[in-house]
Amino acid sequence: AIFQKKIEFKKLGLIIIDEQHKFGVNQRKKLSDKGGKNCDVLLMTATPIPRTLTMTIYGDMDLSIIREKPKMRKPVKTYSKLENNIDDIIRFIKKEMNLGNQIFWVCPLIEESKKIDHQSAIKKYEYLKKIFPNQVSLLHGKTNIEEKEIILNKFLNKKFSILVSTTIIEVGIDFPNANVIIIENANKFGLSQLHQLRGRVGRGFKDSTCILMFKSNLSDNAKKRINILKNSNDGFIIS
């Protein structure tokens, strides 16, 4: 809302932009221009976009890297699995649930599409709740605000174990007890988005796991992206 031309500030002195990779360079410039020459800008992100790194190299930005994570946090272990190995994943989930852990299951679409061969969140929710009765809930972009808050509060209070969702959980979600995230059609996501989604787990002191699901016919670029995620938890390396 504050990017609009009609929005003016009396004396804008500091702009702090979190999740800066969500904004384009021009968007950030428009906002900083509202403050004039005396306005400072602080950008924060876990995964800088390549163009931002280029700006840093050329001296337009000072860079501070915080490599240390909060104490007790462990690196998220990342694995890749073919979609036809879903039975193995289900067995793994059962084991985690028996340990009292919670799971995110992310799908790229809300509903089935005749044009795109992706698993939908609704279809996966229906599938999982048959296997895990009363332990699965669904969240997506069409969920109204009140219902979303109810679902997230129930998940926080461990009223159910599996949250099936679209990428709506990519940012602003902090559930230390959730230590497993499964991402379907992982080859269709960019590195930055996959890294952000993976960051929804590993926020507690337990071992955490990210499983990237994909079909067998991957392109070379898709294989490369998945391998990068499997081999690194460092946002700067990934970018």
Model regions and ranges:
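Inter-lobe coupling/hinge segments of SF2-like helicase ATPases
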Residues: 1-227
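C-terminal or mid-to-C-terminal helical accessory/interaction module adjacent to the motor/catalytic core
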Residues: 108, 232-239
